[in-house]
């Protein structure tokens, strides 16, 4: 009977762990593959909590050899983005900081991140998230865009 309880507990723990994990960020639109030389992103951060998101996003992308440039959040609509060298525009919209921290000390946020392909002007990612760590979000975002790079 003890062994059955342990197996049952292990199965319940496995389901609990699996349900808490967030999956990969998927492309909502179509984007053509890019060359490694095109690994350039332009980022617009909403001013609130921008330092935290800037640090995490730069770490996630620069560790994967992406070039990260910034533009003022309020200048995005005015700028002629097609004349820039970057391939993608990442807009980190207003974030809501949750009241609690993770086990390892990370900060949880809820909000929205949009990614636009500057070659076509199309939105390729619209990621609404709730109660996730900023570093986890930026890492999955870097992996999603990294999937477009051809070798």
Identify the residue ranges that each predicted region occupies.
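N-terminal segment of the mature soluble domain
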Residues: 36-91
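Residues embedded in well-ordered secondary-structure elements
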Residues: 9, 32, 102-104
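C-terminal/domain-edge helix-coil "capping" segments
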Residues: 21-37, 60, 65, 118-151
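Sec-dependent bacterial lipoprotein signal peptides
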Residues: 1-20
């Amino acid at each position: 009977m003890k062994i059955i309880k342990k197996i049952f507990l292990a199965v319940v723990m496995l389901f609990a762990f699996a349900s808490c994990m967030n999956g990969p960020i998927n492309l909502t639109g179509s984007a053509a593959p890019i060359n490694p030389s095109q690994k350039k992103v332009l980022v617009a951060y909403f001013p609130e909590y921008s330092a935290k998101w800037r640090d995490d996003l730069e770490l996630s992308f620069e560790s994967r050899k992406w070039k990260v440039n910034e533009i003022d959040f309020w200048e995005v609509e005015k700028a002629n983005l097609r004349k820039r060298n970057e391939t993608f525009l990442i807009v980190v919209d207003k974030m809501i900081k949750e009241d609690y921290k993770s086990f390892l000390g990370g900060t949880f946020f809820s909000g929205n991140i949009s990614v636009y392909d500057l070659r076509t002007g199309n939105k390729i990612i619209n990621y609404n998230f709730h109660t996730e760590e900023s570093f986890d979000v930026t890492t999955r975002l870097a992996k999603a865009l990294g999937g477009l790079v051809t070798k």
